[in-house]
């Protein structure tokens, strides 16, 4: 029998997550609030974080059904951050569709995000497991949400700065993006019955691949076709976002005319991408992303050889080989 591809494996688990979302987050009164809350969740997304959680649990001997509420909780937290990020970043398009605040207004979007946030903890509390392990997971997720807020604050602060260093960027990315991957892996391990040592190693796996994921995301923003991205190519540059690519280029004395300009022609964008390629900044970030991914994969040495471990390794590789 032919082995399913990584995409098939993730889709298989995602279908269970989607069914659990329907059960645990039904559209009830007031309907518009729950429609707004479910809007991005139902729009799809990769479901990578729930997949990491489920695979971590399975890799240490548990099963999908026992951790489904936790997987849903992590996905709801992810979507809560997207809704609020789009408001703060003034991004009107998400996943190729109008953002939540465009359809329901900023106040409605804030409430939709808050609903997902609170429901995540309510749903996580429903996990049937040892109370001490559920409590540990609640602690992990609550601290993660705080760190995400810290990371978003740092990202916003960068917009007012003339200079941002690589270490500052890495702190921001770790808090804003990678901590939720770390939480997903750790929660899955804890609910699967893993020791604290194994759970911490899986947390490190999530943290490291999450950093690599964001670095590669920054690369894709400048290199992927717009129809794949679902947004304007080079939008980070035009918006004046301090990605590591830009930080590295500025440290080399490179000038980027479209940085913070707000808009640019296709020719201007292509010229900027050529400049970043020729100065080596794009390759620098690509290679650094690869090194984070490889280090993250090494953390899985604590696991026995099993299909789920292989899939976690493949997810790590996917972070730096995807098209969007």
From Swiss-Prot:
CDD domains: Trans_IPPS_HT. Pathway: Isoprenoid biosynthesis; geranylgeranyl diphosphate biosynthesis; geranylgeranyl diphosphate from farnesyl diphosphate and isopentenyl diphosphate: step 1/1. It comes from the Archaea. Mg(2+) 2 binds at residues 85, 89. Mg(2+) 1 binds at residues 85, 89. Its cofactor is Mg(2+). An all-trans-polyprenyl diphosphate binds at residues 94, 176-177, 214, 231, 241. Isopentenyl diphosphate binds at residues 46, 49, 78, 95. Its EC number is 2.5.1.29. This is Geranylgeranyl diphosphate synthase. GO terms for molecular function: geranylgeranyl diphosphate synthase activity; metal ion binding. Catalyzes the sequential condensation of isopentenyl pyrophosphate with the allylic pyrophosphates to yield geranylgeranyl diphosphate (GGPP) which is a precursor of the ether-linked lipids. GO terms for biological process: geranylgeranyl diphosphate biosynthetic process. Belongs to the FPP/GGPP synthase family. Keywords: Lipid biosynthesis, Lipid metabolism, Magnesium, Metal-binding, Transferase. It catalyses: isopentenyl diphosphate + (2E,6E)-farnesyl diphosphate = (2E,6E,10E)-geranylgeranyl diphosphate + diphosphate.
